[in-house]
């Protein structure tokens, strides 16, 4: 009962956060296609490292256990040496480093669980992975906001830019258009104000790896499901052919 209650509360929080972001993105920019390849183990491993180092400080992934990372090629020892910061057992779930009470005091609400965030963000504009990929690449400095940051996909976002050291400071460039007496601001691109530790290409790749991992984390069995699904379709095709030929042989003399 407790587990089911926890699942329901987490999904409600995630969906509520997603609904807010969807409304905020209504007048925003088109979503970029995320480079999702859930069979790319190197990408998944790097994404897991970024997730633990940056996301797990405030967010949890309460329905994901560290030992499940064996599915992406990491041994228990590698997980212990490089990814265990909030617990000392690989069988534990991925809990946030921050105390929930502190998180609520600082942000006004507990940061949502990220286990299935890549699935809950899906909408008409693109997949959940597309949303996350664009969202994490469209932060910019805004001194009028409490956190000092804003976002093109999610205007007035409450979460600060946790990857800012990697990306650096950027400023969006808008072009003013007038139509039927109404002026609108159209996003044209970015101006790099302060360089980060990574080049734009390296940052995009890192975010792509992170989103790839989050897409895999939302359904760790998806690669197995797809692989088994191919064999099931092949079996059904062969079985259908055999059944058709057998049926023809049975009814040949009757006809």
Map each language-model feature to its residues.
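Short, Lys/Arg-enriched N-terminal segments with co-localized hydrophobic residues
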Residues: 1-3, 189
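Sec/Tat signal peptide C-region and signal peptidase I cleavage site
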Residues: 3, 18-24
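Bacterial N-terminal signal peptides
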Residues: 10-19
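Electrostatic cytochrome c docking/interface patches
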Residues: 25-49, 60-71, 79, 218-226
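The canonical Cys-X-X-Cys-His
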Residues: 51-62, 210
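Extracytoplasmic electron-transfer domains, predominantly the class I c-type cytochrome c fold
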Residues: 71-195, 204-208, 212-215
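Juxtamembrane amphipathic/hinge helix adjacent to a transmembrane helix
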Residues: 200-224, 228
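Juxtamembrane interface at the cytosolic side of transmembrane helices
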Residues: 225-230, 234-255
């Amino acid at each position: 009962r407790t587990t089911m209650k926890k699942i329901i509360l987490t999904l409600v929080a995630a969906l509520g956060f997603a609904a807010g972001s969807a409304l905020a993105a209504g007048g925003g920019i088109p979503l970029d296609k995320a480079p999702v390849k859930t069979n790319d183990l190197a990408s998944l491993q790097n994404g897991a490292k970024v997730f633990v180092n940056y996301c797990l400080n405030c967010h949890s992934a309460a329905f994901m256990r560290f030992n499940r990372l064996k599915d992406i090629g990491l041994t228990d020892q590698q997980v212990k040496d490089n990814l265990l910061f909030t617990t000392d057992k690989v069988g534990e779930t991925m809990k946030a480093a921050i105390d929930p009470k502190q998180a609520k005091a600082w942000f006004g609400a507990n940061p949502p669980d990220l286990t299935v965030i890549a699935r809950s963000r899906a909408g008409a504009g693109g997949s959940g992975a597309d949303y996350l990929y664009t969202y994490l690449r469209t932060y910019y400095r805004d001194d009028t906001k409490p956190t000092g940051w804003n976002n093109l996909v999610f205007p007035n976002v409450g979460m600060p830019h946790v990857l800012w050291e990697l990306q650096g400071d950027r400023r969006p460039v808008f072009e003013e258009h007038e139509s039927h007496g109404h002026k609108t601001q159209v996003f044209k691109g970015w101006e790099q104000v302060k360089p980060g530790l990574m080049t734009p290409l390296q940052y995009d790749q890192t975010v792509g790896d992170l989103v790839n991992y989050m897409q895999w984390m939302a359904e760790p069995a998806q690669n197995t499901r797809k692989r088994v699904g191919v064999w099931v379709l092949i079996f059904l095709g062969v079985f259908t052919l055999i059944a058709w030929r057998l049926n023809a042989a049975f009814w040949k003399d009757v006809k």
